[in-house]
Amino acid sequence: MAKTNISPGMQQYLDIKKDYPDAFLLFRMGDFYELFYDDAVKAAQLLEIGLTSRNKNAENPIPMAGVPHHSAQQYIDVLIELGYKVAVAEQMEDPKQAVGVVKREVVQVITPGTVVDSAKPDSANNFLVAVDFDGCRYGLAYMDVSTGEFCVTDLADFTSVRSEIQNLKAKEVLLGFDLSEEEQTILVKQMNLLLSYEETVYEDKSLIDGQLTTVELTAAGKLLQYVHKTQMRELSHLQALVHYEIKDYLQMSYATKSSLDLVENARTNKKHGSLYWLLDETKTAMGMRLLRSWIDRPLVSKEAILERQEIIQVFLNAFIERTDLSNSLKGVYDIERLSSRVSFGKANPKDLLQLGHTLAQVPYIKAILESFDSPCVDKLVNDIDSLPELEYLIRTAIDPDAPATISEGSIIRTGFDERLDHYRKVMREGTGWIADIEAKERQASGINNLKIDYNKKDGYYFHVTTSNLSLVPEHFFRKATLKNSERYGTAELAKIEGQMLEAREESSSLEYDIFMCIRAQVETYINRLQKLAKILATVDVLQSLAVVAETNHYIRPQFNDNHVITIQEGRHAVVEKVMGVQEYIPNSISFDQQTSIQLITGPNMSGKSTYMRQLALTVIMAQMGSFVAADHVDLPLFDAIFTRIGAADDLISGQSTFMVEMMEANQAIKRASDNSLILFDELGRGTATYDGMALAQAIIEYIHDRVGAKTIFATHYHELTDLSTKLTSLVNVHVATLEKDGDVTFLHKIAEGPADKSYGIHVAKIAGLPKSLLKRADEVLTRLETQSRSTEIMSVPPQVESSSAVRQGQLSLFGDEEKAHEIRQALEAIDVMNMTPLQAMTTLYELKKLL
């Protein structure tokens, strides 16, 4: 279409769209947000809405699609969830008063990392991440725009950057052009992230600590610049920038957290069946977020851990007070996100009522905490700011039955503002005045069915049917004529109507102004509200951990400086919860000062992986301050956990490859210290037997001689158990079994020493493999076991058979029994007497193919 044919309105659209080429532009036109051109075509497909066109009769109609403004949020949510950006252009003036084209401007750009409003609010964090690289180290900053949380750190390598982004579950990452193409490809293709590029850095340093490194400062500034650019307003709810160090927390990669099912079950991608699910007895959205953060980042400071333990113990010892506390927390709304809505100018009357209701609960919560009469709890109590003046303002100003939208009126309480009360009185009494006029004129005119009605066009009027027109008084004046009636007005009615309309307009305008003023006053309290939110969230998580500890009979773990692990009758907390206490079989775990490696053998399904995960979860729960599932626990403080738990167990099915195994093993042996915990399950099984065994042995020796980390190494390579004679810090353990009358029972108990058998064929039997196959497997196993093979682990293995021999061996494994059975069934099904010669030849040919 030639530019000269474009209407002024469409030219305005194109001018705005030019500035937001990577976003869907929602262009407000009356009661709809319209999309045009390619945006319309693509949005119609993604949102499943109708695609029409503007100027349908033109040579080149403009594709157009639209959504109602009152339900636009649900459509925006869909686009954001799919990874797109949305720019919202609003009408900046009343169309009735506009001269020419209505002025429109983009008021916000919504991206996957900057979501504040949602039709389906989620209590989880939504982090936006920025990364900068100075050629040596990486700066990483993250922010949750919906809560104001703002943090920064620096990292040594891209592997750490990738892991941190995964741990944060970020959906959008801001970059400069300093990351390599390979690194950007990993972020986009492997991690499914939206990349946005931001070169400029925010100039206002008021939110940025001067102690930051240059690369951290750049990452944080880049993040601030992007948020201000997309949100287009001052964000008073952004919290002071917090600098953190990865080493201040128990370090775990995303793969480790996934394999341990910390925040979601890796198989189902659901919360159910995770540690988060188990420990979540929180009552507030803020508490839920903080609990997840504690699980993600267990502590390494003994002092901080013991502080949490002490408060949990106090809560455990006072059931009645703790129950009252839990019930009071149920009345606490999401202060962090309510504060952000205030800051964004989006808080509605319901939001302020929720904030007021929360503040009304705070004195009760504070009194309950004081009743525990504990010095450690008092530290929390002393920091609680009840904000009574803000609670009073909201309680006296906002009507408890106020609607969710500002435009509906009836927001401000009667008695809060004299002028507003006057206008409301006029409207209220005006209704009575109109009723009086109606009664007076009905009696004076003799028109028995005379009544006063109202519509927007004619205002208030007397409704007179045609049959009564002769009775209409002289002071009535005609306003409208209908088919069977006429509408009349009077000077008195017009005067009352004018007073009422003026009162309604003034009341609506004044009420809006009062609400805006109250919201502005609330905004001045945001910093105090955020501090209160943190304390209430902490209290919520601690009471949650106390409830879980009492419900599941957990104990308070101890810590030592001797590198000793003592767990008596420990349980895998999540498995126990799913199975039930009566079904679960506990296991003790012991590492003395001299022991660094446990080599565990035993068949699949016997409990090796559960045993390993049990130790990891016990460590994580202990170091986040929680009580743990055992009769007694004494642990060293670990600085990191490294795992490689393979795909044979259903927990992370389909994720294991030999390359991933080796990469994760490499990360462990390079990054682990003697204060780390390493859990390797069946390492080396993804390659040839001797290759796998050789790698497994070499890795064990490396950890033993150079790393010194506490390690559990599960293996099917029985030959590796002889390492205990050569490595002084390695001990063998196995999963006990009971063998009776040819049947094998897995006892799920860990015992000292190596396993004497693998029981792989028994596991195959449980899996339901054909009996003939199992019988053949027994024959092959017997033959292999009788062959003379060296079991000396350091010796060179015998030469591998030729590929043809291997193929023959693979074929002979199954034998001819099943094939013969198949041929026999085919022969028995033949009706020889009724076959034609051609059918007989065809059947013979098919039988021959079975040989």
From Swiss-Prot:
Superkingdom to which the source organism belongs: Bacteria
Taxonomic source organism: Streptococcus pyogenes serotype M5 (strain Manfredo)
Single annotated GO MF: ATP-dependent DNA damage sensor activity
Segments forming a coiled coil: none
SUPFAM superfamilies, A to Z: DNA repair protein MutS, domain I (SSF55271), DNA repair protein MutS, domain II (SSF53150), DNA repair protein MutS, domain III (SSF48334), P-loop containing nucleoside triphosphate hydrolases (SSF52540)
Keywords assigned: ATP-binding, DNA damage, DNA repair, DNA-binding, Nucleotide-binding
InterPro entries xref list: DNA_mismatch_repair_MutS (IPR005748), DNA_mismatch_repair_MutS-lik_N (IPR007695), DNA_mismatch_repair_MutS/MSH (IPR017261), DNA_mismatch_repair_MutS_C (IPR000432), DNA_mismatch_repair_MutS_clamp (IPR007861), DNA_mismatch_repair_MutS_core (IPR007696), DNA_mismatch_repair_MutS_N (IPR016151), DNA_mismatch_repair_MutS_sf (IPR036187)
Listed PANTHER family: DNA MISMATCH REPAIR PROTEIN MSH1, MITOCHONDRIAL, DNA MISMATCH REPAIR PROTEIN MUTS FAMILY MEMBER
The keyword DNA damage is assigned to this record: yes
An annotated GO BP: mismatch repair
Function: This protein is involved in the repair of mismatches in DNA. It is possible that it carries out the mismatch recognition step. This protein has a weak ATPase activity.
Listed name of the protein: DNA mismatch repair protein MutS
Binding sites annotated in the UniProt record for ATP: 602-609
Family annotation (Pfam families): MutS_I (PF01624), MutS_II (PF05188), MutS_III (PF05192), MutS_IV (PF05190), MutS_V (PF00488)
Entry GO terms, CC: cytosol
UniProt record similarity statement: Belongs to the DNA mismatch repair MutS family.
